[in-house]
């Protein structure tokens, strides 16, 4: 494929934008470098770049675009918002409609508040949990990404009962010491952390199904045990459902798994492609939020009509009968096709697939936590990513990210993708 215009534009972007991208995940650092492709437009399941190349897209903007690009129902809603004014700074009736839709889909959301992003939603749930419990520390799980605010840019110390250390320049040591990081799916380490720091722990922050070191399900009984132990300790449980809400069913991963948190943070899908976040939970906890309580959260753009109307339209599309069954069918087809191609060419892969989301790890070992994900072969993934791009398949440029199937993908797209995998695996073996 010709990528000359993408290269020209990236060179120009480097002169004006830090690193040439507005989010580091858009660079190709995670796949060994190279020029990120600059896209011109998108429609349905397809991307079209500035050089005129067409791709089947599984990036889906890192998750939000579950209905495909430029879905007509969502486009109509956004157009209506633009015609009527995109920002008021006042309440609107649409906020009420959307809040009711979220509550009906995810019953643990007894009260809801809108924010501008998933990062803001998670950040505020922690603040609210601290206000409710009068405690300061949180427990999080290694490799789970919860946004780019200081408190969650923390990695594990030397063991499960040690305090965290900064995972980014600019995060202070004192901030990191408010966080205890333990391995996902490791109940013994979680118990040890609670035993050490329990009376200081305001909340346990967890992705109920991990989406940030690939798609990883909780071990049987893991989330139930977290709930029980946290509540015995007087701590709250916060689910970060920024990736998982409405991903596996019409509702949250908590509905899908049957385990209920105290607070939930959401983003991505619920905006239909526009910036949004939301959080909610038990009434007694949510009433700690201003103007009813002492925990402050505000935002000029929070609840803006464009994002709210886009979100309403997205959820309306997701109520289509049989849609999640189709996600499951296509997800299973992809997993099966990739695994068969890997066996055919003697390439070790593990595919974690949950409904319409999957991750291809280059390893013959199961992946159940961040350490295991980190041990997979990143060099092979980089070659695979670049090979798939040349075959017209757009993936996220990181071995830790998921593929997302949208309502716009067809069976023909899935079969074409499987053929591309076969072709790329063959080239990878040939070019050893």
UniProtKB/Swiss-Prot annotation:
Positions bearing N6-(pyridoxal phosphate)lysine: 268
Pathway assignment: Porphyrin-containing compound metabolism; protoporphyrin-IX biosynthesis; 5-aminolevulinate from L-glutamyl-tRNA(Glu): step 2/2
EC code: 5.4.3.8
UniProt superkingdom: Bacteria
SUPFAM superfamilies, per database record: PLP-dependent transferases
GO biological process assignments: protoporphyrinogen IX biosynthetic process
Subcellular location: Cytoplasm
Subunit and partners: Homodimer.
HAMAP family per UniProt: HemL_aminotrans_3
PANTHER family: GLUTAMATE-1-SEMIALDEHYDE 2,1-AMINOMUTASE, GLUTAMATE-1-SEMIALDEHYDE 2,1-AMINOMUTASE 2
NCBIfam families the UniProt entry points to: hemL, PRK00062.1, PRK12389.1
Name assigned to this protein: Glutamate-1-semialdehyde 2,1-aminomutase 2
Gene that this polypeptide is encoded by: hemL2
């Amino acid at each position: 494929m010709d990528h000359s215009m993408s290269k020209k534009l990236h060179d120009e972007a480097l002169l004006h934008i830090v690193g040439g991208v507005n989010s580091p995940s858009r660079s190709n650092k995670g796949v060994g470098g190279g020029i990120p492709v600059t896209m011109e437009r998108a429609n349905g399941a397809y991307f079209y770049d500035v050089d005129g190349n067409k791709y089947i897209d599984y990036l889906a903007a890192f998750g939000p675009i579950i209905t495909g690009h430029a879905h007509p129902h969502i486009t109509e809603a956004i157009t209506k918002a633009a015609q009527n004014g995109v920002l008021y700074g006042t309440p609107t009736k649409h906020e009420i409609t959307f809040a009711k839709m979220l509550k009906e889909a995810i019953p643990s959301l007894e009260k809801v508040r809108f924010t501008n992003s998933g990062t803001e939603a998670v950040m505020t749930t922690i603040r609210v949990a601290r206000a409710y419990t009068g405690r300061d520390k949180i427990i999080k799980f290694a490799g789970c990404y919860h946004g780019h605010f200081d408190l969650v840019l923390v990695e594990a110390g030397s063991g499960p009962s040690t305090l965290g250390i900064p995972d980014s320049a600019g995060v202070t040591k004192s901030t990191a010491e408010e966080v205890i990081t333990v391995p996902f799916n490791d109940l013994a380490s979680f118990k040890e952390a609670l035993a050490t720091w329990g009376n200081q722990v305001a909340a346990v922050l967890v992705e109920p199904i991990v989406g940030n070191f690939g798609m990883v399900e909780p071990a049987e009984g893991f989330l139930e045990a977290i709930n029980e132990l946290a509540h015995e300790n007087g701590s709250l449980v916060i689910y970060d459902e920024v990736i998982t809400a409405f991903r596996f069913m019409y509702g949250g991963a908590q509905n899908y798994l049957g385990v209920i948190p105290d607070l939930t943070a959401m983003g991505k899908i619920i905006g239909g492609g526009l910036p949004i976040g939301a959080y909610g939970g038990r009434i007694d906890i949510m009433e700690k939020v201003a103007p009813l309580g002492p925990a402050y959260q505000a935002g000029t753009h929070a609840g803006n009509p464009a994002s709210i109307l886009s979100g309403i339209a997205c959820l309306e599309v997701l109520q289509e009968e049989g849609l999640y069954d189709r996600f499951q069918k296509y997800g299973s087809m992809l997993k099966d096709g990739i695994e068969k191609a890997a066996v055919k060419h003697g390439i070790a892969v593990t595919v974690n697939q949950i409904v319409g989301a999957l991750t291809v790890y280059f390893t013959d070992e199961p992946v159940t936590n961040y350490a295991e994900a980190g041990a997979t072969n990143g060099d092979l993934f980089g070659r695979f990513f670049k090979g798939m791009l040349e075959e017209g398949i757009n993936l996220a440029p990181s071995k830790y990210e998921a593929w997302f199937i949208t309502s716009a993908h067809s069976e023909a797209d899935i079969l074409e993708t499987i053929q591309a995998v076969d072709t790329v695996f063959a080239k990878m073996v040939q070019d050893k």
